[in-house]
Amino acid sequence: MKKFITLSLLLAVGFANAQAFKGKGDVKFNLGVNIQDGGSGIGISSDFGLGENMSYGFAASYLLSASSDDLGNKPEFGDRIDAKFRFNANLGNVFQLDKKMDIYPGLDLGLRNFGAHLGFRYFFTEGFGIFTEAGIPIASYKTSPVGFDKLNNQFVFNIGASFNL
């Protein structure tokens, strides 16, 4: 019984201290699945707090499974990878969400486009949570992307684990 009570108290303290975004000096790391039309893969991102409601960061993705084109050609490494610089507005406290939750719209400047994303984080403990993000290109660097240029240059959905560093 003592072990059960001790474990319950430790978990309660961990859940009570969980916080999705703390502000300046906060560092988050996300690791998840990248899902889009024509392929799926892995995505990582990291965000660094600048102020109470602002952060900047970096994101990268690599498509592990990507569809062949009409001629049977497979995308090369350069077609499968993407990297972006991002800026977020962390609005969890603005919307008076629980401290374990954060919603963050943002802008991306990447290898293939200028885009936007909307994300949500929920932390179960001080160091571990889940996240989900949806992103869209606003302006592609190629006026009419065709073939493999469409990979990483379209609506994308990410879901995975979030870590407080």
What does each model-identified segment do?
Residues 31-37, 60-66, 89-93, 109-113, ...:
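Transmembrane beta-strands of outer-membrane beta-barrel pores
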Residues 27-31, 58-60, 85-87, 105-107, ...:
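Membrane-embedded beta-strand positions of outer-membrane beta-barrel proteins
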Residues 1-24, 165:
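Cleavable N-terminal export/targeting peptides
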Residues 44-82:
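N-terminal, post-signal-peptide region of Sec/Tat-exported proteins
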Residues 30-42, 106-117, 144-154:
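Solvent-exposed loop/turn segments connecting transmembrane beta-strands
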Residues 19-24, 52-53, 92-103, 124-128:
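Short loop/turn motifs that connect adjacent beta-strands in outer-membrane beta-barrel proteins
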Residues 17-56, 87, 156-158, 162-164:
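Short glycine/proline- and aromatic-enriched beta-strand/turn motifs that initiate or cap beta-hairpins
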Residues 59, 63-71, 121-165:
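Predominantly the C-terminal beta-signal and adjacent terminal strand-loop region
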